[in-house]
Amino acid sequence: MAHDNLFETVEMGTQTLKNRIIMAPLTRLRSVEPSDVPTALAGEYYSQRASSGLVITEATQVSFQAKGYAGAPGVHTKDQITAWKAIVDNVHAKGGKIVVQLWHTGLVSHESVQPDGKAPISASNVDVGVRTSLRDSDNQAIRVDATPPRPATLDEIKQVIADFAQATKNAQEAGFDGVEVHGAHGYLLHQFWVEQTNQRDDEYGGSRENRARLTLDVIDACVDAWDADHVG
């Protein structure tokens, strides 16, 4: 095409991407259970895609409570940060840039992967009949019904915000070029946005402004933890 600029550089905040091809986040479930540490295979996967202008990692948990899928990675322990740093270094060595997508699955989870075997948190105790992915005794992926959720307490909401902020700091420590906050697709932040799953009557429920509050609080906390140029 006469005016094709796909392979031209583009500015992203304070950073320059070498082209305009962006790899979207795709869940691979290639982490070690139960520590949620990314494997060498995950590192190879991202390294192979470093020729794009920007790699966005698969959704990555901000805490053990944020976990919903067996095999999904985290970025909240030292071992996880160390593993991610090796992956990031390999992408950078090939001239690529990489950001980590941060998530909390909320009700899309199962008690078997939750701390102390508790029910997963959500905005309210609304069971929407979703399924998630676990592993059987042969380490094979299996689909199961999610455990019906419980409403998050205000203290738990504060902890979620703090977990996103700490995960942002951890991403910076691992050398990532930024973080992307996952606020869609029916996961925790989205569950607070939607009236079907948010039936709260406190400052996080009711009006549109209140239902947006958790997402905005999370973004503010992530920006405070790093800066606005590195948070999306």
Residue ranges and their predicted role:
Residues 103-170, 174:
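Non-globular sequence segments
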Residues 42-63, 174-178:
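Catalytic domains of carbohydrate-active enzymes, especially glycoside hydrolases
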Residues 20, 59-116, 154, 159:
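Acidic/aromatic-lined carbohydrate-recognition and catalytic surfaces
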Residues 36-49, 159-169:
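Short, acidic/polar
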Residues 23, 49, 91, 100, ...:
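Conserved, mostly hydrophobic/aromatic
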Residues 1-25, 50, 91:
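N-terminal amphipathic alpha-helix/helix-capping segment at the start of soluble metabolic enzymes
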Residues 20-22, 54-56, 97-99, 178-180, ...:
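Structural preference for beta-strand elements that scaffold enzyme active sites
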Residues 73-99, 194-231:
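Alpha-helix-loop-beta-strand connector modules within alpha/beta enzyme cores
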